[in-house]
UniProtKB/Swiss-Prot annotation:
A cellular-component GO term for this protein: cytoplasm
Organism name: Streptococcus pneumoniae serotype 2 (strain D39 / NCTC 7466)
Name of this protein: UPF0298 protein SPD_0651
Family listed: Belongs to the UPF0298 family.
Keyword annotations: Cytoplasm
Pfam families with a match to the protein in the record: DUF2129
Main location: cytoplasm
Localization, UniProt: Cytoplasm
Superkingdom classification of source: Bacteria
């Protein structure tokens, strides 16, 4: 049966858009901005620290940031319409 795997997002800034194909082996690419040359990569939470260190050393990557979407509170209270 299907088991839920906790995943964390990484925002990876690239020098060239053509290097995005090289990152498919590391995790799931959910978004790629060709204009701003970054992509969002989802990886298992246990591997985040190792991957940030490994990806930061790659020559085709400008910067790696960890996405903090899991730290936001999602139960919204109140009316969304004004």
């Amino acid at each position: 049966m299907f088991e839920k795997v906790n995943r964390s997002g990484l925002i990876i800034y690239l020098y060239y858009n053509r290097d995005a194909k090289k990152l498919q082996d590391y995790g799931d690419i959910t978004y790629h901005s060709k204009k701003h040359r970054y992509l969002q990569l989802y990886v298992p939470t246990q591997e985040v620290e190792q991957l940030v260190g490994r990806l930061s050393k790659e020559k085709f990557i400008k910067k790696v940031r960890v996405c903090h979407i899991q730290e936001l509170e999602t139960p919204f209270v109140g009316n969304l319409y004004r």
